[in-house]
Amino acid sequence: MIETISAITLATHDMARAVHFYEALGFEIVHGGKDGLFTSFRAGTCYLNLIAQSVDRHWSWWGRAIFYVSDVDAFYANVIANGYRSDEAPRDAEWGERFFHLTDPDGHELSFARPLG
């Protein structure tokens, strides 16, 4: 029986740029860093990992990592204050979450959410 997700690993063409992005969002590095080939961030009780890939390696898939945050609007304000953009402001969804989406520098879609009520 599956208990939980331990980690999500995303590829990056520029580790320094990706590390800067995720640190600006408040992710804490637990391994690696801007000069590494592999970096791991704490994401609650799980981990978000980055693995460096050569620029000639391309990916053409779609997926989304969803992270629960304590305050969606405050998190969004921090994203904007750090110079990043989201296609739309946080909103309440019919499935019972407040959320917004953000795309990282390598094109990975992220969602930051919180259950309503």
Regions found by a protein language model. Name each.
Residues 1-19, 64-65, 113-117:
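N-terminal beta-strand motif that seeds the catalytic metal site of vicinal oxygen chelate
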Residues 4, 61, 96:
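Exposed loop/turn and edge beta-strand positions of beta-sandwich/beta-sheet ligand-binding modules
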Residues 9, 28-34, 91-93, 117:
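Conserved catalytic-core motifs of GNAT/GCN5-like acyltransferases
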Residues 13-15, 65-109:
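Vicinal oxygen chelate
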Residues 23-30, 83-85:
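Conserved acetyl-CoA-binding loop of GNAT-fold acetyltransferases
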Residues 28-62, 109-114:
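Conserved short beta-strand elements that form part of the metal-binding/catalytic scaffold
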